[in-house]
Amino acid sequence: MEFSGTPQEWNAYIAGQPHAQFLQSYEWGVFQKSLGRRVWYLGGGEQKESVRCLAIAYPLKGTMFYLMCPRGPVGVPSDVWSKEFIKWSHEQGAQFARIEPIESVPMKATHVRDVEPSHTRIVDLSKTENELLSVMHPKTRYNIHLSQKKGVIVAAKKYNEITSDELAMWWALSSETAKRNKISVHSREYYQKLLTSFPYITLYQAKWQGSVVAMAVMVGFGDTMYYLYGASTQEHKEVMAPYLLQWQAMVDAKNVGYRYYDFWGVAPDDSSTHPLAGVTRFKKGFGGEVITYPGTFDIPFKKLPYILYTLLRHVKRSL
């Protein structure tokens, strides 16, 4: 069941899937290892029947752990391989298995709160720039042009070009944004490792009169450019820098051959109470189509430890 090929062979398969999932890339496993987690590369089948699953172990209390396949398994038939992953997870001694299937859901799975967003908005970059602009909300187009007139400058750097000062600026802006919007963020160490080691990262920054007013972390993998994280300051918000930053990232992605631009999470049906409600209106203005995945599912092997885990998670979130 464990994959015996090369990293290049792994990525060739994952990146070759429609709307390729970077969370199943070989390098995402390497990044998870750098965080101290155990990972496995699982695979089976030939050609059209081939399936891949990057499995990550997340620690629980003591020596207990659960195994997760983020945004996967990938391939056809994924429902059959979801069952294989669940069986394998049980054999490894996991307390439960967690999957985020692309399509169908195995029986006896418990639908839980999303880890990765189950609703997202995707823009088809095969259209011309004028066509992309024409399907945007008029206010979004206006803000893009306004930002250009105000003199906002957008620049991008690959993961191996990002400086320590830019990392510090990202942390400052993301912390400010999280506090303003009352959302949680990863640790500073997490961002530092991600931005400087994951090879599909591009860090965008928008400057106005020499000051950084907005930044965004993009991930380009396979046929898709993902807008993973965004941050901005309230100062000089009148120059509408995040709008021009997004537009420039879309144009850049189109010009280097990406087919899709994924906004990585929106609220379902524009729900006003969803955690992503605050950014959904902004993302919706750029057009595109809403795509819905089944969600995140747990398959517990031992009921009591799983019940205790869910209770502790609920208490922690309510504090």
Question: Can you say where each PLM-predicted feature lies in the sequence?
Answer:
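A conserved beta-strand-loop-helix scaffold within acyl/acetyltransferase catalytic domains
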Residues: 2-62, 101-106, 111-123, 127-238
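Aromatic (often tryptophan-rich) hydrophobic motifs at membrane interfaces
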Residues: 83-86, 192, 196-307
